[in-house]
A protein has these predicted regions:
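Catalytic core of non-heme Fe(II) oxygenases with the double-stranded beta-helix
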Residues: 58-151, 155-157, 163-164, 168-172
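Non-heme Fe(II)/2-oxoglutarate
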Residues: 1-64
Length: 172
């Protein structure tokens, strides 16, 4: 997958909606043979809606990856859909922070309650890029320190963020 990503970065135009991150759609059929056994063991039999190869160059603030189900599946709306992260490479320390709060809105909104959660200094350091408004609407962060080869999965409705990796010298 690293070779594929390197080739895409060198030769293909990234998705405009995800710039400045380098993000490329990949047909699941091209990677199904390698990914299907991993996904099946992690989630059970599942349908893959989207595959992206990405090089993230700015920290992601608090958001979720929820997209409403379409008519192309036999799943009922509300059935869990998972985001699965397969870290390929980073040039330094990286974390994904997952919160228990869920929403069908892409980021915390006025409709989401203020939690009153008191973040530790370590959590605050990891999330210096997240606006206070969003921080007030999430709680109890699960911090996942990852490296190449890991597999991390969470419900797409859960709010999550990257750490502020630039603060500790990681550029992607």
């Amino acid at each position: 997958f690293n070779k594929i990503l390197d080739n895409f970065i060198a030769n293909k135009k990234p998705r405009e909606e995800n710039l400045p991150h380098l993000s490329y759609s990949v047909s699941y059929a091209h990677v199904e043979k390698k990914l299907s056994p991993i996904l099946d063991s992690l989630l059970g039999s599942c349908e893959v809606a989207e595959v992206l190869l990405q090089r993230v160059v700015q920290p992601h603030s608090i958001h979720n990856d929820y997209r409403p189900p379409t008519n192309t599946t036999d799943r009922e709306p509300g059935e869990p859909h998972y985001a699965v992260l397969f870290p390929l490479r980073a040039d330094g320390l990286s974390h994904t922070i997952i919160f228990p709060e869920q929403s069908v809105n892409a980021s915390p909104s006025e409709d989401d309650p203020v939690t009153g959660y008191e973040f530790t200094d370590e959590h605050k350091k990891l999330l210096t890029h997240a606006p206070d408004y969003s921080m007030h609407r999430v709680s109890d962060p699960q911090v996942v320190k990852w490296s190449a080869g890991d597999v991390i999965a969470w419900d797409r409705k859960n709010f999550h963020a990257s750490d502020n990796f630039i603060e500790h010298g990681t550029s992607y």
